[in-house]
Curated annotation (Swiss-Prot):
UniProt GO MF annotations: identical protein binding; RNA binding
Source organism per UniProt: Mus musculus
Signal sequence bounds: none
Subcellular location field: Cytoplasm; Nucleus
Lineage: Eukaryota, Metazoa, Chordata, Craniata, Vertebrata
GO biological process per UniProt: cap-dependent translational initiation; regulation of translation
Record's subunit section: Interacts with EIF4G1, EIF4G2 and SLBP; probably tethered by SLBP to the 3'-end of mRNAs ending with the histone stem-loop, it also interacts with EIF4G1 which is bound to their 5'-end.
Name of the encoding gene: Mif4gd
Role according to the record: Functions in replication-dependent translation of histone mRNAs which differ from other eukaryotic mRNAs in that they do not end with a poly-A tail but a stem-loop. May participate in circularizing those mRNAs specifically enhancing their translation.
Protein name: MIF4G domain-containing protein
Amino acid sequence: MSEASRDDYKIQSFDAETQQLLKTALKDPGAVDLERVANVIVDHSLQDCVFSKEAGRMCYAIIQAESKQAGQSVFRRGLLNRLQKEYDAREQLRACSLQGWVCYVTFICNIFDYLRVNNMPMMALVNPVYDCLFQLAQPESLSREEEVDCLVLQLHRVGEQLEKMNGQRMDELFILIRDGFLLPTDLSSLARLLLLEMIEFRAAGWKTTPAAHKYYYSEVSD
């Protein structure tokens, strides 16, 4: 993969002015309003789930560029403040826009995956990420394939890191997931398969065995 394609950050869906703003933030962060940049990235992440999967990488790059250029963290502070605001309003978001809710969970997990303090995940994000995943593991969420898919994808991405930060909450989360799998609910056959795969994935030390991969992914393709 070329350097250009690796660093495009999926910003083609922005208008030309915003693309230029983001490119400048990446190269010369002191030349732009970084709080505005943080809001632009969060706003777009709530609308575009493809971008929300890439946004953490872009945010990390801007944070690194700002730190190197000025030794400051204006962008990170603005980003975390906005994440907190959306976290506080997460129930309203889920009620009015399922897509927006799934994009938000994808985004906050992506940020948790990329942002580091002293080479460790940010403690401030651990409980908010867990709270979002707990909501996805509630019975009414498990009846929606979009939310089950999001739960499983995010646990694949950050589950192992989260467990290292707070193993007790991961145990509690998997009690909910097992109950959802075992108790009579409105689970689709695909959702049931995804939950079983996730239960076995964690039991295997957050790894998919070759046999499990062959079984589950042949089932999904069928």
